[in-house]
Amino acid sequence: MQSWSSAPVPIVPGREPELRLYDTADRQVRPVAPGNTATMYVCGITPYDATHLGHAATYLAFDLIHRLWLDLGHEVRYVQNVTDVDDPLFERADRDGVDWRDLAAQEVALFREDMAALRVLSPHDYVGATEAVAEIIELVEKLLASGAAYVLDGEHPDVYYRSDATLQFGYESGYDRDTMLGLFEQRGGDPGRPGKNDALDALLWRAARPGEPSWPSPFGPGRPGWHIECAAIALSRVGSGLDVQGGGSDLIFPHHEFTAAHAECVTGEQRFARHYVHAGMIGWDGHKMSKSRGNLVLVSGLRAEGVNPAAVRLGLLAGHYRADRFWSQQVLDEAVGRLQRWRAATTLPAGPDAAAVVARVRQYLADDLNTPKAIAALDGWATDALDYGGHDEVAPRLVASTIDALLGVDL
């Protein structure tokens, strides 16, 4: 699947400190120590609706990681999937009277436009689940052969994963069983399905039903479950020893827990990823942003209104990536004003020395992507430049390059 074009990333003199990120499994901030090539897998969209600000905030967080790794001199192997075969997609296509494949193609195209407008660096591999069916089938076969999966008896011989197949299951989320069961039911699971060995067992392969797409397999025609898609794509594109698995905090359980468990079953490793990183949720004017409330703020909608995507990006980066936070007109207005001040300061013929502020920006971003502190440091430099001027002719360009390279904001 085609991704999108990335804008060039400036090279900033100097070197960033070691990157440290909060790991959901360990419940602490600790160093990320990739080799020459840093690897990251981030869960992509289910393409049945347009990109909203919650999506955007998540992908901006991992874009920062991508940029900081580049600043450290790493090659980056970044993989993102598209869940282009799933119930919400089929339901929306049926509601709108369109082919599900056409709907998916339309929404993926819009997502690409939104990501390019927000200057999110494109993934190395952008893979639809429908493009990875062979790898998914191979992984399900391995799980069946090892006893980690079983075929359900009955009219629909679906394949399920045994939630007790690994001793470490549950380490990523740290949730107790009751919490798991509640979230499993809320987020696409089927704890009440008759015939399963355990209520928490997760669907690997849904046997063919009338009116649904299906693919042939050794265990019968059908289509992939949700979690196995990401496990198969990550293992086939990156392999074991992933540096970062990421997504929104609503994916911690069941999606990321099961994705990791599926992969760990076949690799024998205790951890699918060295770091599990999750971004907070975005609300609107004090309320949770959701389709049911009808209060989604769409990136494409803001662009259509003439809002500068750089201001959208800067507004989302004003909050810490792990925090649940709210978008509002005030947030946007502050971002627009900040963008104007930064542009005015970085187009001066000279300004205050920039070495110290560049070092602080790197330091703050390396400390679990502390964008509020990094932005505050840049605000301070811009205020000094506009109020008092300076004699360093290189400083304005250096600050502009730093903002571009590390924060992804083009002034």
Curated annotation (Swiss-Prot):
UniProt motif 'HIGH' region: location: 45-55
Residue sites binding Zn(2+) per the record: C43, C230, H255
Reaction(s) the record says it catalyses: 1D-myo-inositol 2-amino-2-deoxy-alpha-D-glucopyranoside + L-cysteine + ATP = 1D-myo-inositol 2-(L-cysteinylamino)-2-deoxy-alpha-D-glucopyranoside + AMP + diphosphate + H(+)
Keyword annotations of the record: ATP-binding, Ligase, Metal-binding, Nucleotide-binding, Zinc
Name of one Pfam family that matches: tRNA-synt_1e
Cofactor(s) the protein needs: Zn(2+)
Annotated GO biological process: cysteinyl-tRNA aminoacylation; mycothiol biosynthetic process
Gene3D superfamilies membership: Anticodon-binding domain of a subclass of class I aminoacyl-tRNA synthetases, HUPs
GO cellular component terms, A-Z: cytosol
Binding site for L-cysteinyl-5'-AMP: C43, G44, I45, T46, T58, N81, V82, T83, W226, G248, S249, D250, I282
Motif position, 'KMSKS' region: 288-292
Cofactor notes: Binds 1 zinc ion per subunit.
Enzyme Commission number(s): 6.3.1.13
Key word S-adenosyl-L-methionine present: no
One function term, GO molecular function aspect: zinc ion binding
UniProt short sequence motif 'ERGGDP' region, positions renumbered to this chain: 186-191
Record has Amino-acid biosynthesis as a keyword: no
Family the UniProt entry places it in: Belongs to the class-I aminoacyl-tRNA synthetase family. MshC subfamily.
PANTHER family: CYSTEINE--TRNA LIGASE, CYTOPLASMIC (PTHR10890:SF3), CYSTEINYL-TRNA SYNTHETASE (PTHR10890)
Complexes and interactors: Monomer.
Purpose: Catalyzes the ATP-dependent condensation of GlcN-Ins and L-cysteine to form L-Cys-GlcN-Ins.
Stored NCBIfam families: mycothiol_MshC
Protein's name in the database: L-cysteine:1D-myo-inositol 2-amino-2-deoxy-alpha-D-glucopyranoside ligase
Species, as recorded: Mycobacterium ulcerans (strain Agy99)
Gene (name only): mshC
